[in-house]
Amino acid sequence: MKNIINRIAAIALSLIMLLSLCPFAQATDNATDVTILFTHDLHSHFLPSNEDDGGQFGGYARLMTVIQEEKAKYPDAILVDGGDFSMGSLFQTAYPSSALELRLMGAMGYDATTFGNHEYDYLQAGLKSMLNAAVESGDPLPQLVISNYWPPEKGQDGYDADMWAALENYGVKDYTIIERGGIYYVIFGIFGFDAQDCAPNSGMILEDPVATAQATVDAATKECKDNYGTEPVIICLSHSGTSGGEGEDYELANAVNGIDVIISGHTHTTLAEPITVNNTLIVSAAEYGKNLGVVNLSFNHLKRTCTLDSYELIPIDEKVEDDAEIAAMVEGFKANVENEYLSKYGVSFDEVLVNNKYKFDTVKEVYATLHESTLCNIFSDAYKKAVEDAGIKVDAALTAAGVIRESLPVGDVTVSDVFNAASLGVGTEGELIAVYVTGSDLKNALEVDASVQPLMSSAQLFFSGIEYSVNTNRMIFNKVDYARLRNNDGTLSEIENDKLYCVVTGMYAGQMLGSVEETSMGLIGITPRDKDGTPLTADQLVNHVVKDKHGNPVKEWYAIASYLKDMDGEIDEKYAEVDGRKVVYSSLNPVKLLRNANKFTYIVLAVIVVLVAIVVLVVRAIVRKAKKKKANKN
């Protein structure tokens, strides 16, 4: 009996010891759950946006509701953003003065975000002002991280002490380390090459993304291990992007060791499943707050492994209720915009300008093919009319696909709708400029539209005051086979090569057109000039901003809004369908292939003639040699 009791005691003692070791075994062998909530490319879309099918998506109040629901399920979740949090709605007009975007993100509990190219649209002066305004507000703010895109340092050209002071005042860092639920996270920001190309006036210096990212990962990991004795989860907020499963962020993940997750912004990509490369997950949730991305991982800090448990993109749509607190903040910010900005134009945020019963191109359709677009006809016609109303005789106006951010909805079209559609600008909200070009360069602009669009869809141009036709089978830079000025009275005029013509466009498109000669390596050029024919540099275009009769700059969005408001309540029926100002067709008819041929076609024809002549000469030589050889045998 005593032996039995001893055995039972021994077994009980063993069980007690085993149970006491279980927590240790779990801590050492089992992974810890990690949840990352993310967005990117929010573009100041505080309010819901219109779907192509008539529905709505996004809106920060709805987004906040879903964030709270996910945090209720995952209390230790972190919330991050991949940049381009600004520029895309009327709220951007308060960017320099009030920093509405960062303040709202702070209220929503964002842990960190990074800079995208559009954060530099107001140039360094606007960025400095915005950062200081954010701090002065006293509101909670997300940590800003960027590791490879900083201003020139003291002693370098372009050094700006105030810019550095604003960055330091906000507390912008290469990376940040945060702890949540016993897990440490390293979060750092990366700026991509294409993003840099899209921010040519930022005044910042781009360091190599790969080299900087690897150095940042190594330094931050060491700091975390030295200070906290543990391996961190490493998250890169990258404003570089992917395309077709590849792209800059794919190359970044492939080249840099140690990144667990890349939040990939800039390209407005939706990834239904993560891209996995070099043990790194690349994730994207679409633009404008369409979805909240949710990544659930199992992280073993001892083995330094991160395993994907689940990945979800939660739609932010009409089924989601508004969060009352964020909705109230947005309404307050709307009043801010009306008082500080819209009051100068005598309009209000939700003012209905016109009713629209026509379905216009979506932005994707604008980009998709070379074509005439009723939506873009409205925009270019509005530019021309606004500048003519300012007392300037205009021959033509143009807009580019790349500056059109949204379509106009069916039904009531508001001031906010118009601004959202034409919100892309350089430095401010996009002023119109009036410059002069020769007839030859005006034809070159038509060729840029016809020849470059298949290679770069954002370069498609849409004109007012010109009608032309494009044969897609003709030679590059000679695809336009017919072009005439379309005068206000409906008559047509020849475009004379040496004559100067007044052309109106937005500042952004004007700068891009001025760089055509450089980007085409001299093959084709468009030189903006003043009324006397003197060439203008890109920096001089600001001196040609159009002013209205009261001396105020004419904005792209306001030109469109005024044009619509003058339509007496309904969109003019002439915009129900295209009017033939751009005709695109394909023909191999020799007459149509050679009609109005220019130097590019003649050069190719000359090359073909020379090649044919060489072939003929070679064949003749071979035949003569054969005949001579045969004669010698006889």
Name each region found by the language model.
Residues 1-12:
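Bacterial N-terminal signal peptides that target proteins for export
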Residues 25, 243-250, 254, 327, ...:
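Short secondary-structure boundary segments
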Residues 17, 110, 150, 164, ...:
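A residue-identity detector for tryptophan
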Residues 30-35, 45-48, 53, 64-72, ...:
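Catalytic centers of hydrolytic enzymes
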Residues 19-30:
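Sec-dependent signal peptide cleavage junction
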Residues 28-319, 375-378, 382, 436, ...:
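Acidic, metal/ion-coordinating pockets
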Residues 11-20:
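Bacterial N-terminal signal peptides
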